[in-house]
Amino acid sequence: MTVKIGSLTLNSRVYVPPMAGVTDIVFRSIVRTIDPGCMMSTEMVSSRALLAKPESRLMDLAAGEHPIGIQIFGHEPDVMAHAAQLAEKRGADFIDINMGCPVPKITKGKDGCALMK
């Protein structure tokens, strides 16, 4: 069964969510051996940090690693838009905006689930 999200066609119903400290490029390559067509995202990356260091290894994508999204977090629309453009240039098929992280380190900066307030 295929799933279509915008212009993205998925041949798998499996989505491996972004997990800080887990979904790095090595983990994703292992998952791809099990389900090559599953949808995955990178670990979450600070939008502001991406603007300061656009060559961040957290956005490294392997050749053929599609479909793949890059998850960003932040709360400043202009900064997030620019970070999303950088992620797109790095090869992301979609941008995943983190709006669910409840960790105090993230929410005290008005990011993650604090965006839902």
Regions found by a protein language model. Give the residues of each.
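Extreme N-terminal starter segment of soluble prokaryotic enzymes
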Residues: M1-K4, L8, S12-R13
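Glycine-rich, positively charged N-terminal anion/phosphate-binding segment
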Residues: T2-K4, M19-D93
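Short, solvent-exposed beta-strand edge segments and adjacent coil->beta transition regions
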Residues: N11, E65-G69, K110
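Glycine-rich tight-turn/loop motif centered on a GG-T
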Residues: P104-K117
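Feature marks short, surface-exposed loop/turn motifs that line or immediately flank catalytic pockets
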Residues: R48, C101-K105
